[in-house]
């Protein structure tokens, strides 16, 4: 995996927080960029997992292997809004493909449909989102607050989201691999 230059930032890229991002929701976060333009950017934090149970009336999981459904804090903006990332190509008519085999769709009705669904479909329900005004993300990138990495379905739906930050840095190699070993609490170093 090669670090990407800022000029290649686009939908489907991963923003990996620098160790300099200290504290707050973006500390050690990995953000999937869902939209990027001159007007601004929006993405979803993938590795801030929430341990919650949604009532069956809100989100029916009977057609899913519950181990393939995760809840996370997508970002600090509009935390009451739920964004849905999934691997179900059959719902692509109501979804946007963010990167190969990863779709963003806000309509939960397909979750209850059996047809075309396999128990291997993976889902990530993100509460809230992350957003930047035009030029803001570029400024943060130039200040060294973010690294850019390519994404994949395997990274986004990893079985070990708590290790995603260090795993992505390891895959970037070089100095990034050594950054991945920095303890979260430097007093423990």
Swiss-Prot record:
Transmembrane parts of this sequence: none
Task: Tell me where on the tree of life, at the top rank, the source sits.
Answer: Bacteria
Classification via Gene3D superfamilies? VC0467-like
InterPro entries noted in UniProt: AlgH-like (IPR003774)
Q: Which GO terms describe its cellular component?
A: cytosol
Q: Which family does it belong to?
A: Belongs to the UPF0301 (AlgH) family.
Q: What is this protein called?
A: UPF0301 protein CTA_0231
């Amino acid at each position: 995996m090669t670090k990407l230059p800022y000029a290649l930032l686009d939908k489907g890229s991963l923003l990996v927080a620098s160790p300099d991002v200290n504290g707050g929701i973006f500390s050690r976060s990995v953000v999937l960029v869902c939209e990027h333009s001159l007007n601004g950017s929006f993405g979803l934090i993938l590795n801030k997992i929430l341990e919650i149970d949604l009532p069956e009336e809100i989100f029916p999981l009977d057609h899913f292997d519950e181990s393939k459904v995760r809840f996370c804090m997508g970002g600090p903006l509009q935390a009451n809004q739920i964004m849905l990332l999934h691997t179900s190509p059959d719902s692509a008519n109501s979804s946007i493909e963010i990167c190969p085999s990863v779709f963003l769709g806000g309509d939960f009705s397909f979750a209850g449909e059996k047809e075309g669904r396999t128990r291997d479909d993976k889902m990530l329900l993100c509460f809230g989102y992350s957003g930047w005004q035009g030029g803001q993300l570029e400024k943060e990138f130039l200040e060294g607050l973010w690294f850019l990495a390519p994404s994949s379905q395997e990274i986004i739906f990893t079985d070990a989201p708590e290790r995603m930050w260090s795993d992505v840095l390891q895959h970037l190699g070089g100095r990034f691999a050594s950054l991945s070993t920095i303890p979260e609490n430097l007093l423990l170093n």
